[in-house]
Regions:
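A short beta-strand-loop structural module common to alpha/beta enzyme folds
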Residues: 20-30
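Acidic beta-strand-to-loop metal/phosphate-binding motif
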Residues: 61-67
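Short Gly/aromatic-enriched secondary-structure transition segments
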Residues: 10-17
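Divalent-metal-activated hydrolytic enzyme cores
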Residues: 1-9, 28-42, 52-61, 72-129
């Protein structure tokens, strides 16, 4: 949702997935929402929008993003990374046939893949600005 992360993330994803366009499904603190799954209405809304992206737009991958100074998830980096990892696990249950990655946008607005992103897959771009 935060405009400060949109362009760096879109640029990263265009390069990472070798695509011209990126669908954006935005919520404040999506990593925490999908990790905790306590707000079923919002989780369902996110999944409905991701379904459109994957099924109708034939998206090549899904990225879940956390970032520095997030108002929707004011947790520290370590906890947000844990939320990202849990969110990835949750999304992989719904989308097992598509690549799902977690990204952390730091205080300098650099996009970084989180550790353990692609178990068994080669790391494409560790950092992008």
């Amino acid at each position: 949702m935060d405009g400060r992360v949109q362009l760096p993330v879109i640029g990263f994803l265009k390069k990472y997935f070798s695509v011209h366009y990126v669908d954006v499904v935005s919520e404040p603190g999506p990593n925490r929402i999908l990790a905790e799954q306590s707000d079923s209405k919002t989780v369902k809304s996110i999944l409905n929008r991701v379904n459109i992206s994957v099924q109708k737009h034939r998206s090549k991958g899904i990225a879940i993003v956390g970032h520095y100074d997030c108002a929707g998830n004011p947790s520290d980096k370590s906890e947000q990374i844990s939320h990202l990892q849990a969110a990835i696990s949750f999304l992989r249950k719904h989308y097992s046939e598509i690549e799902i990655i977690g990204l952390w946008v730091d205080e300098n607005w650099y996009v970084n893949e989180i550790p353990g992103n692609n178990i068994g897959r080669p790391l494409k771009n560790a950092q992008f600005c």
